[in-house]
């Protein structure tokens, strides 16, 4: 009986098409700014936004200029304010990571590369709106006026910590900014946000709730399990 030929094991290491310093090409992106229409955010139906969930909403052209119906038409002052918050967040993250690596903090998570997500969206909110963050959205507190010293006090867990050491580091809470406490279990922010949104609707309040999701949350039971109505 002939021996089975062993299958050769190979290792594939993916590499980025462009490295820092290279001129990137965005030719594979076929969408142009404005290819996906911008529906009325109040009156649109779910079917009108299906392509937006699976497609690419482009605001910037290849030269970095905003155009099309998704252009927010920000003023230079608004752009500078957003950039200032993002740079501050990057510097804050770098300093706190050094503290964690040298044993001065027990735990820390950066928002590296995601600074604009929370900061830009929080800038678009009204002051009465609620924020239900994850670990990656601490920059929203800068927009709402929280100072870095207060955030550092929380991460260290010292006597000036506004939650008195009852939370892990980077589990911020900021009552004045309607920034709800970060939860350790991922995915819980969705049910919290929905609950507050429903309460606001019952009371006819002019408020909205915003929350975020990442790969971890989208894979957890709280997010993927069907509701009793779906059973």
Provide a role label for each language-model segment:
Residues 91-94, 98-225:
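Cofactor-binding active-site loop characterized by glycine-rich and histidine/acidic residues
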Residues 2-131:
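N-terminal amphipathic, basic-rich helices that act as targeting or association modules
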Residues 226-231:
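A short, hydrophobic C-terminal helix/tail in secreted or cell-surface proteins
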């Amino acid at each position: 009986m002939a021996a089975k030929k062993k299958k050769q094991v190979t290792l594939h290491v993916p590499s980025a098409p462009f490295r820092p310093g290279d001129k990137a090409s965005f030719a594979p992106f076929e969408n142009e700014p404005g290819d996906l229409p911008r529906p009325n955010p109040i009156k649109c139906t779910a079917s009108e936004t299906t392509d937006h969930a699976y497609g690419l909403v482009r605001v910037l052209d290849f030269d970095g200029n905003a155009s099309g119906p998704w252009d927010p038409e920000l003023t230079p002052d608004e752009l500078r304010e957003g950039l200032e918050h993002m740079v501050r967040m990057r510097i804050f993250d770098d300093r706190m990571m050094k503290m964690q690596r040298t044993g001065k903090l027990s735990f820390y998570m950066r928002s590296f590369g995601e600074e604009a997500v929370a900061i830009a969206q929080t800038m678009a909110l009204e002051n009465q709106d609620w924020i239900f963050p994850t670990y990656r959205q601490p920059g929203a507190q800068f927009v709402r006026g929280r100072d870095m010293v207060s955030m550092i006090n929380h991460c260290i867990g010292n006597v000036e910590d506004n939650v008195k050491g009852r939370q892990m580091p980077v589990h911020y809470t900021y009552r004045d900014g309607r920034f709800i406490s970060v939860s350790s279990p991922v995915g819980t922010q969705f049910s919290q946000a929905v609950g507050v949104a429903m309460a606001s609707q019952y009371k006819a309040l002019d408020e909205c709730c915003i929350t975020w999701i990442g790969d971890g949350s989208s894979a957890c039971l709280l997010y993927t399990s069907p509701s009793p109505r779906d059973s």
